[in-house]
Amino acid sequence: MLRLSDATYLVRDHDEAITFFVDALGFALREDETNASGRRRVVVGPADGGTGLVLALTDAADAVGNQAAGSVAFFLETDDFAAQHARMTAAGVRFSEEPRHEVYGTVAVFEDLYGMPWDLIQPPALG
């Protein structure tokens, strides 16, 4: 069995990224360790499991917020779109569009702390 455990997410600052992911998106801080050489490893992800994001510092400032060249790179799936949308909006997350209904579910695009677009999506009920 294979599963994607983590993906790299480029950041300018670990602490500002932790604040966004934990406070605004409701993620858990899964790991925050500094090794003997001084390199810090930070991993955040949904509290109930799934793929984590390794928050990686980079000197390539133009890459931060542009990891997918302006396209949506990450998709947050929820089973209660209205509640998550309201919670995220109250936490200061900026949605760039109103929620819309598509054949693949209810979706709205939001921007992360660096302006990169993400989807919040609730798939249609199966049945």
Predicted feature locations:
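Residues in soluble alpha-helical coiled-coils and helical-bundle/repeat scaffolds
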Residues: 9-12, 79
